[in-house]
């Protein structure tokens, strides 16, 4: 059973987060290992496995990029374990330039202001790519969606670097 079916959700990218959380809580109550404490070992193990599956499914569907990767995995794309080389040279050049820009920000006297502007631009790029990905997933353009997800992973890693720099700047200021 796929994760969407487990939670009673349609297999599409845009999901109802409240419905996901409500169904997660219901399933957790239903399959919590404590409810099976007095049952035979086989049933206890089955409930533990089911609870683990429910947790994995919830974490996957709750996180937007993981949800997209999961949808693609249902179509045969294993983005989590692939060693795919990005062939979009314009995107790769843009990423190199963004990383260089981010590295340079840390050494500037107005680093906080520059980082805030950089972060806004990055958020806009991510929003644009996410909208593109949603359209591709809805249209079942799996190859294009997989490529867009790969690009979103780059942007996600860059966002993590932005957050790390924010922490360093805050620590230096404190």
From Swiss-Prot:
Gene Ontology cellular component annotations, sorted alphabetically: iron-sulfur cluster transfer complex
SMART domains: DnaJ (SM00271)
SUPFAM superfamilies hit by this protein: Chaperone J-domain, HSC20 (HSCB), C-terminal oligomerisation domain
Entry keyword set: Chaperone
Domain J: 2-74
GO BP terms: [2Fe-2S] cluster assembly; protein complex oligomerization; protein folding
The organism's place on the tree of life at top rank: Bacteria
Gene Ontology MF, one: ATPase activator activity
Function of the protein: Co-chaperone involved in the maturation of iron-sulfur cluster-containing proteins. Seems to help targeting proteins to be folded toward HscA.
Database matches in NCBIfam families: hscB, PRK05014.1
Assigned protein family: Belongs to the HscB family.
Subunit structure comment from the entry: Interacts with HscA and stimulates its ATPase activity. Interacts with IscU.
Protein name (Swiss-Prot/TrEMBL): Co-chaperone protein HscB
Gene it is expressed from: hscB
């Amino acid at each position: 059973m796929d994760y969407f079916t487990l939670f009673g959700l349609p297999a599409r990218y845009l999901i109802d987060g409240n419905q996901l959380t409500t169904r997660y809580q219901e399933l957790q109550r239903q399959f919590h290992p404590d409810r099976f404490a007095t049952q035979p070992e086989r049933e206890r193990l089955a409930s533990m496995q089911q609870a683990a599956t429910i947790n994995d499914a919830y974490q996957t569907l709750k996180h937007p990029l993981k949800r997209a990767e999961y949808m693609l995995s249902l179509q045969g794309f294993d983005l989590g374990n692939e060693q795919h080389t990005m062939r979009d040279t314009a995107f790769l050049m843009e990423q190199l330039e963004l990383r260089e820009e981010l590295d340079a920000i840390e050494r500037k006297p107005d680093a906080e202001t520059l980082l805030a502007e950089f972060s806004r631009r990055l958020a806009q790029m991510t929003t644009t790519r996410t909208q593109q990905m949603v359209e591709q997933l809805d249209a079942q353009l799996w190859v294009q969606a997989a490529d867009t997800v790969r690009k979103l992973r780059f942007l996600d890693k860059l966002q993590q670097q932005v957050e790390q720099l924010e922490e360093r700047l805050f620590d230096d200021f404190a």
